Amino acid sequence: MAGAVPLSFATWQALLNNFAIERAAFTGIEIGVLQSLREIPGFLAFGVVFLLFLLREQSIALISLALLGVGTLITGFFPNVMGLYITTVIMSVGFHYYETIQTSLSLQWLDKDKAPEVLGRIIAVGAFTSIVTFGMIWLAFDLAGLGFTVVYALGGAATVLIALICAVSFPQFPVKIRQHRQLILRKRYWLYYALTFLS
């Protein structure tokens, strides 16, 4: 799943400015609004705590991953202001909720001794996938002559496919420790909270 996020997000990010200007006739104002809308789900990511009352973390992660993929997949089909705003919010909800859950899941499933090494590998897989995705986008445009719609669809579809494969292959990991279902804030972590909020 670590490689699935960059397939969609790197595709969306790499193509966004050119797509917005060339196809949706965006100006600086619309780009500013789009970027603001993209960050709203990030501010609301604490809402994951409430979803935990309804769904397991693994289910939330898979749904979020699929939502990220769907948002990216349909972006190219909506080359207008409202279409790009809506697809961006869909993609962003998936991205931010997945990122919120994946760290928690990783720390639950990994042994404490191996967690730093494995988390480093997970980040490396994501970075490598981003680089490969950027290369594939370049090949798709320059060598294959594909357009925005097809490239967005391929990037998003790859993420959705990975989410579906993970849902079928790993239906339910055992939960060793029961997860808290309430928001816990500790005064001593104020700096971490502030930096996370500002990021």
Give the label of every model feature segment:
Residues 22, 46-54, 131-151:
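Transmembrane alpha-helix termini and helix-breaking/packing motifs in multi-pass membrane transporters
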Residues 3, 71, 82-98, 197:
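Hydrophobic core of transmembrane alpha-helices in multi-pass small-molecule transporters
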Residues 137-141, 156-175:
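C-terminal membrane-cytosol helix-exit motif in multi-pass small-molecule transporters
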Residues 66-79:
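C-terminal ends and interior cores of transmembrane alpha-helices
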Residues 16, 97-110:
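Intracellular juxtamembrane helix-capping segments at the cytosolic ends
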Residues 117-136:
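Glycine-rich segments within core transmembrane alpha-helices of 12-TM secondary carriers
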